[in-house]
Curated annotation (Swiss-Prot):
The keyword Ribonucleoprotein applies. Keywords: Ribonucleoprotein, Ribosome biogenesis, rRNA processing. GO terms for molecular function: snoRNA binding. This is Ribosome biogenesis protein Nop10. Involved in ribosome biogenesis; more specifically in 18S rRNA pseudouridylation and in cleavage of pre-rRNA. GO terms for cellular component: ribonucleoprotein complex.
Length: 60
């Protein structure tokens, strides 16, 4: 089994455990997703990000 370092979103501490040993919050994997030039969902993810942030092309 490969261990990945995890980070607590509440207190910001790093650990290898599923729950934070300090505050008890569920931890998240601290590594970003793997990059692929042939990303099949990249277009949709970028479109959603533009919509959520309110940036991008203006509709005429």
């Amino acid at each position: 089994m490969r261990f990945r370092i995890r980070k607590c979103p509440k207190c910001g501490r790093y650990t290898l455990k599923e729950t934070c040993p300090v505050c008890g919050e569920k931890t998240k994997v601290a590594h970003p997703p793997r990059f692929s030039p042939e990303d099949p969902y990249g277009e949709y993810r970028r479109r959603l990000k533009r919509e959520l942030l309110g940036i991008g092309r203006k509709e005429k």
